[in-house]
Amino acid sequence: MSASESALLPDSLLLNGREFRYLDVQQYPANSPTDLNGYEARVLDFCRQWLNGAQEFTLHTSGSTGTPQSVTMTRQQLEASARRTGDYFDLGPGERMLVCLNCEYVGGIMMLVRAFERRMHLTIVEPQADPFALVPAEADFDFTSFVPLQLRAILAAGHAPRLNRMKAILVGGAAVEKGLERDIQQLTVPVYLTYGMTETASHIALRRLNGPNPTPTYRVLPGIEVGQDERGCLTIQADVTRNELITTNDRVNLLDAHTFEWLGRADFVINSGGVKVQAEKVEQVLEMALMELGLTTRAFVAGRADERLGEQVSAFLEGPALPAAQQQQLQALLGQRLGKYEIPRELVFVPQFSTTASGKLDRRATIQSAP
């Protein structure tokens, strides 16, 4: 690399609009502003650890699919994940990374690691619905990652041209509903839905959502071995798992050694009168029906206790109750497209869905708060 090229490499990062030189970050909290908020302090502390060569890191799961847990990851695991993503998207020195995920969880943490490992310019903003509201209008980026809620807000705010100047965009942390997937088709920048978890140091597979060849299946990244257990749930083994076999609760259709279709979580199966109903299958039909009625309501499906059936299939919708006529139209569409035992027996309207700190839908909390 020439001297002129080296001069273009980053020696600082931007956090909420303020510049922090790496030499100062390595000495954090010395030489730091006294008015940092808690989030900024925690981000800088992780950056300090990474830049100073720490070998172990404690990561926290979001709790969206169970009780939040702490997971110890080695530097080698995080480096392997960053290297795999960097190679796949050809991320290189001097390119620009926007980090707007919560950096207290693996999605945001791995964005930081990728930027450090690939020597990319790093702009970090505190998570909010429209991250572009926090960066200058003239700022452009090459790579970023959003949760679906953010991408929905960004498109609604008219920021598609800014997205289209990027090399690629990741979307993860929650399912992408049909309405958002339709809106993504307007983008020329490649958009990928990620599959992964804290225990795999973020994603191990990607699904292209737009462009000439969108696909309903996930493609496993090079060097990752996948299989299935006796339940049909995905197993994962690779350097990011310390070569230990991890068994997930995600039911998949494994098409070959590198491709799978995600069917739903084993723990989201509703046992209604002895008939097992996969909640995510009903959700897909529900989302399509809402789209046909011109509704942008967020929704999900889960089981609720029922004296006769044990569990009944229930559809939870965000916002005020729909007019009776629309509810009848929705139920009619569901009745046409779902099996007898799959049809939601009730529509439950919740003013606002609960989310975790990492931006994921918190189903359990939402169900508990529902009327």
Specify the residue positions occupied by each region the protein language model found.
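Adenylate-forming AMP-binding core of the ANL superfamily, especially NRPS adenylation
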Residues: 175, 205-245
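Gly/Ser/Thr-rich phosphate-binding loop
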Residues: 157-212
